[in-house]
């Protein structure tokens, strides 16, 4: 029998092997609704755990500072060509270690300390790296934040335009971590042109939907597009920069290395190449469409059970549930769902009176459980389980019944059946 990496780990470090086994069991037995999480394929994990982890390769393919890079050059070149085809981009850099690193490289290219950036407020669904005061982006640059409308939970592009005319940002940022509606990139382009700003789209959450044609692409409109490679794209954890401007692309390359990073993680880049190849297949388009259908089914059922959703629903993979109508905080809701093996995350809602550590909302997403094969009926069932638990938080009988239903759902949609950690060794 051929030994696997997990066999070696169980022999050499049984304590860590046991931890990994417990995490595997958690993933198998829990309903995963964190919108930024997904389950990668076995092929992605195999690439990331390969011998490419041993290779240093500062620079770009064909222009390395180390010898012996001929094969990692091939892998990285394949990742670049695949992602360019996937998104229709003229230029791509696959080296950023994360979405935040990709954003920092863009800032280094386009901005000087003290320049003004304009992005969505974190409490309205933006991201830390879009100018939050606790992040480097909020410390190095002047920041103007826009948000959604209180009545609709949606962007008002006329108001964003008026704000941009007043503050005249050098960089206008669109793309969010908790906005459940489609983004109109053409309207942002018009605003950026009017004020003379660069336009950046951070599509970390919707990248898979964009790649599969289920969300409009920002590339025809934006000077630069950044993203993570996990979430809806279902690859390894990492970042990516794309542009249709070749001259800017060369500058972004220099801002990644040597500007913000040293050696690239070639094992992760190879895993990205695997994921990009998977996303180019017809099955991925079907998957992405199902992600949206499942999110909408869950959102509709939650509304039927009396829950308020920010903006009244969703166009993508996520939704924000405002728990103020049932006098519950996001922190409590998160804990209650955790007790029945549903993993979600507390999240601020627009105009939230609670602190970010408490919040008034829950963010729920469909990508991970869609990967496990669940469809609309299962997501309506999940919505009912959530409603039953949150509407009867003190009822131990309801809690036990919810836990049973979660267990049955997970058992019907197995995860990583091929993975085996030799428990005899780690016991």
Curated annotation (Swiss-Prot):
InterPro entries: PyrdxlP-dep_Trfase, PyrdxlP-dep_Trfase_major, PyrdxlP-dep_Trfase_small, Ser_HO-MeTrfase, Ser_HO-MeTrfase-like, Ser_HO-MeTrfase_PLP_BS, SHMT-like_dom
Subcellular location: Cytoplasm
Alphabetized Pfam families for the sequence: SHMT
CDD domains on file: SHMT (cd00378)
Any single GO CC term annotated in Swiss-Prot or TrEMBL for this entry: cytoplasm
EC number(s) given by UniProt: 2.1.2.1
Associated pathway: One-carbon metabolism; tetrahydrofolate interconversion; Amino-acid biosynthesis; glycine biosynthesis; glycine from L-serine: step 1/1
Catalysis: reaction(s): (6R)-5,10-methylene-5,6,7,8-tetrahydrofolate + glycine + H2O = (6S)-5,6,7,8-tetrahydrofolate + L-serine
Annotated positions of the N6-(pyridoxal phosphate)lysine modification: 231
Role played: Catalyzes the reversible interconversion of serine and glycine with tetrahydrofolate (THF) serving as the one-carbon carrier. This reaction serves as the major source of one-carbon groups required for the biosynthesis of purines, thymidylate, methionine, and other important biomolecules. Also exhibits THF-independent aldolase activity toward beta-hydroxyamino acids, producing glycine and aldehydes, via a retro-aldol mechanism.
Membership in a protein family: Belongs to the SHMT family.
Protein name: Serine hydroxymethyltransferase
UniProt organism field: Synechocystis sp. (strain ATCC 27184 / PCC 6803 / Kazusa)
């Amino acid at each position: 029998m051929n030994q696997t990496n997990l066999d070696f780990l169980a022999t050499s470090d049984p304590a860590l092997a046991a931890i990994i086994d417990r995490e595997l069991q958690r993933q198998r037995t829990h309903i995963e609704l964190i919108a930024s999480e997904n389950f990668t394929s076995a092929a992605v994990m195999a690439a990331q755990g390969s011998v490419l982890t041993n290779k240093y390769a500062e620079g770009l393919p064909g222009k390395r500072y180390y010898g012996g890079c001929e094969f990692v050059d091939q892998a990285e070149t394949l990742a670049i060509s695949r992602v360019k085809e996937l998104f229709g981009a003229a230029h791509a850099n696959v080296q950023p270690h994360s979405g935040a690193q990709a954003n920092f490289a863009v800032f280094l290219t386009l901005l000087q300390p003290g320049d003004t950036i304009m992005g969505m407020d974190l409490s309205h669904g933006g991201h830390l790296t879009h100018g939050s005061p606790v992040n480097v982006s909020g410390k190095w640059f002047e920041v103007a934040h826009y948000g959604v409308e209180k009545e609709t939970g949606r962007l008002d592009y006329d108001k964003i335009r008026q704000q941009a005319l007043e503050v005249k940002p050098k960089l206008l940022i669109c793309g969010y971590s908790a906005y459940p509606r489609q983004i109109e990139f053409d309207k942002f382009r018009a605003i950026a042109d009017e004020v003379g700003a660069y336009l950046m789209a951070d599509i970390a959450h919707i990248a898979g939907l964009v790649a599969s044609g289920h969300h409009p692409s920002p590339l025809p409109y934006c000077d630069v597009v950044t993203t993570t490679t996990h979430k809806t794209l279902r690859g390894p954890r990492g970042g990516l920069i794309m542009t249709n401007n070749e001259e800017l692309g060369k500058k972004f390359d220099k801002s990644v290395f040597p500007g913000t990073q040293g050696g690239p993680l070639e094992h992760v880049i190879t895993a990205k190449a695997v994921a990009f190849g998977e996303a180019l297949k017809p099955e991925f388009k079907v998957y992405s469409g199902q992600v949206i259908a499942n999110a909408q089914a869950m959102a509709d059922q939650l509304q039927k059970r009396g829950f308020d959703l920010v903006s009244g629903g969703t166009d993508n993979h996520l939704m924000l549930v405002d728990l103020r109508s049932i006098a519950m905080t996001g922190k409590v809701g998160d804990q209650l769902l955790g007790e029945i093996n549903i993993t979600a995350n507390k999240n601020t809602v627009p105009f939230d009176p609670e602190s970010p550590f408490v919040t008034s909302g829950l963010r729920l997403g469909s990508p991970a459980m869609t990967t496990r094969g669940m469809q609309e009926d299962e997501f309506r069932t999940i919505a009912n389980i959530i409603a039953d638990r949150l509407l009867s938080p003190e009822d131990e009988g309801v809690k036990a019944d919810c836990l049973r239903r979660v267990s049955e759902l997970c058992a019907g949609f197995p995860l990583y059946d091929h993975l085996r950690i030799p428990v005899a060794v780690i016991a």
